[in-house]
Design a protein with these regions (language model features):
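Short, conserved catalytic or adaptor-binding loops enriched in Gly and charged residues
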Residues: 75-79
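Short S/T/G/P-rich N-terminal loop/turn motif that feeds into the first structured element of a domain
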Residues: 1-47, 52-66, 80-101
Length: 101
């Protein structure tokens, strides 16, 4: 499996609008096992994105999907910048089917 955890900063006061866009059109991404958008509790403009994919290749391919491209274009003006980004190897857990159970 392939995992990503990243911090995104919204333009001041635009976090709700940005999170709404990031949640649009993300329900049909082949290979995506988990896609979670979370608000940072200590920074009113920060968002954490946690993704789990079956393969890195499917993650990369998802960036070319029309719905994802549309969301990126719509979100771009609301993004002030990016913070930490971590690549992980998810092993499993509650809500994540790994095929190993």
């Amino acid at each position: 499996m392939y995992g990503l955890i990243g911090k995104m900063m919204a333009v001041s006061g635009q976090r709700d609008a940005l999170t709404a866009i990031l949640l649009e059109g993300t329900s049909d991404m082949p290979g995506c096992l988990s896609y979670i958008i979370a608000e940072d509790t200590t920074d009113a403009n920060a968002i954490w994105i946690t993704e789990v994919w079956d393969t890195e290749a499917n993650h990369k391919a998802s960036l070319g999907l029309p719905a994802v491209q549309a969301a990126i274009a719509k979100a771009r003006p609301l993004i002030a910048g990016f913070g930490e980004r971590f690549i992980t190897t998810p092993l499993g857990g509650v809500g994540l089917l790994t095929g190993k159970q």
